[in-house]
Design a protein with these regions (language model features):
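Conserved beta-strand edge residues that scaffold enzyme active sites
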Residues: 46, 69, 136-137, 160
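Conserved active-site tyrosine of GNAT-family acetyltransferases
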Residues: 146, 151, 174
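GNAT-family acyltransferases
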Residues: 1-104, 167-192
Length: 192
């Protein structure tokens, strides 16, 4: 766990990563029923109460083991996706990253930009030197995100994770190390 971790705003060009709010729950409910998101990110939330609980868990950084952001367009701040740094381990100096983008916002580079922003922020302010990204081999879009966000492919994990279809898929494991792909420039962070 990392002490004194609190929600921040991160901005880069057209993308803003912001703290979660209760107003995000209806969009989360719709997004987490998208078959693509359910397949690669787990089960759907059944109702608005579950979506509200999902948002509250991501908004609460008090345990210091995760940092979760709502992905939005800088103009308007409407919710377009999610990016989370989780399993933050300051002893080992590593963390994992995950994300999803709503169907209407896919194909515009939002996920890669969001992942890059979170990595730069994490390396600038957290005691982590390594961030891992894993995705099912069949999820080619996540491979493109990893490449664009400066991650290095490390290998294949055989039958390593049970995805939303109930099947254990092989995964590709990527990492980004402190010092890979530039510095923390271009990240504007402010406390929520």
């Amino acid at each position: 766990m990392t002490a004194a971790l609190g929600p921040v705003w991160l901005r880069s060009g057209p993308v803003t990563l912001r703290p979660w709010t209760d107003a995000d729950a209806p969009v989360v409910l719709a997004a987490l029923h998208d078959p693509e998101i359910v397949l690669w990110n787990g089960s759907a939330v059944p109702d608005i109460a579950a979506a509200e609980a999902w948002v509250r868990r991501r908004a609460d950084w008090s345990e210091g083991d995760h940092a979760s952001f709502a992905i939005s367009a800088t103009a308007g701040l409407a919710l377009l996706g999610s990016v989370s740094l989780h399993e933050i381990d300051p002893v080992q100096g590593d963390a994992e990253i995950g994300y999803w983008v709503a169907a209407q916002a896919r194909g515009h580079g939002l996920a890669a930009r969001a992942v890059t922003l979170v990595c730069r922020w994490a390396f600038a302010v957290l005691p982590v030197d390594r961030i891992e990204l894993a995705h099912a081999v069949e999820n080619a879009a996540s491979g493109r995100v990893a490449e664009r966000a400066g991650f290095t492919l490390e290998g294949r994990l055989r039958r390593s994770y049970r995805y939303g279809d109930g099947v254990k898929h092989d995964e590709l494991l990527w990492s980004r190390l402190r010092g890979d792909g530039g510095s923390s420039t271009g990240v504007c962070g402010t406390r929520a």
